[in-house]
Amino acid sequence: MDIEALKKHAKNIRTNIIKEVSNANSGHPGGSLGAADILTVLYFEVMDFTKENAGSMDRDRFVLSKGHASPLLYAILAEKGVIEEEELLTFRKLNTRLQGHPDLNELDGIDMSTGSLGQGVSAAVGMALANRLDHNDHRIYTLIGDGEAEEGQVWEAAMAAGHYKLDNLCAIIDENGLQIDGRTEDVIGPAPFEEKFRAFGWHVISVDGHDYTALKAAFDEAKTVKGMPTCIVAKTVKGKGVSFMENQAGWHGKAPNAEQTAIALKDLQEGEEVWQRLHVKRMVKK
C-alpha cells in the first residue's frame, strides 16, 4: 500500500468536492470531506472496481446510504477515470447526470439510487443475499452516516443481515458526531454502535477513519470473517481538510462562497490555479 499515493488521491478528491459544491452553490461538503479517506482506501486498495468494470454487475459493489454525500462519490468516480473531471462542474445543474443524490440510471459505477436515509442499508443487505443465492463471491459495501442511524430501517436491515449471516457484507459507520441539527448525541444519540451491531450478530471493528493503514487492515480483516457481516465504525472529522469546516455542523449542507472557496483550496494545498484550470468564474456575495 502506497500511503503517499493514497494521500494524493484523497487530496484530489477533497479538492473536487469543494469545486462541485461551490460551483453549484449547493450541496453537502462536511460529510463528503469527512468520509473521503474511507472511500479512498476502499476504492483504491480494497474493492474490485475499475473504469473498465464500472458498468458491470460482476464486481464488488458499493451503496452510499448517506446519499447526500454524492459530491464524494462523484469525485471518486472522476479520480477512477469513470467520468471526466470537467463533468463535476455540472453537479446539481439542469439536465446533469450528477444529481444532488446518486441515480443508478445516470452513471456507471453507481450501484443504488439513494437519498432517503436508511434505505441504502436495506438495499445492501438485499444485494449481499442475492450474491449468496447466485454463488457470486463479490462483496457488498455500504457507508452509513451516524445521524442516518437514527432511522429505524437501519436497525431492521442490521437485524436481517445478522440473521442471514451475510459475511459478504461490510457496513461502514461514518461516525463524525454531527448532523444537520447539531451533535448526534443531542438529537437522538444512536451511539454506541459497537455494542448495538454486536447484539445483532455482526463482527465489529473500530478504527480512526483518517488512518489509511488502520482502514486497510479493517477491510482486510472483514474479508476473513465467516458466518457474520462486518461493521467498521470509523471515527471521522466532519469537514476534514478544510480549516473552517472541520467539526462544524453548520457545514453539513451549505456551499462556501467565493472567498471561502479560495481558503478551502488553499487549505487543500491546491490553490486557485485549480479553479482557474477549469475556467470557473463565479462571484458570490458574502
Can you annotate each of these PLM segments?
Residues 68-69, 73, 176-177, 211, ...:
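Glycine-rich beta-alpha junction loops
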Residues 212-286:
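Glycine/aspartate-rich loop-and-adjacent alpha/beta segment that forms the canonical ThDP
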Residues 9-26, 174-176:
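N-terminal capping segment at the start of a domain
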Residues 109, 113-116, 121-225:
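Thiamine diphosphate
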Residues 17-21, 32-163:
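Cofactor-binding active-site loop characterized by glycine-rich and histidine/acidic residues
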Residues 1-5:
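Non-catalytic, mobile gating and regulatory segments of ester bond hydrolases
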Residues 63, 170, 206, 231-233:
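Structured core elements
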Residues 80, 187, 246-250:
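Short secondary-structure boundary/capping segments
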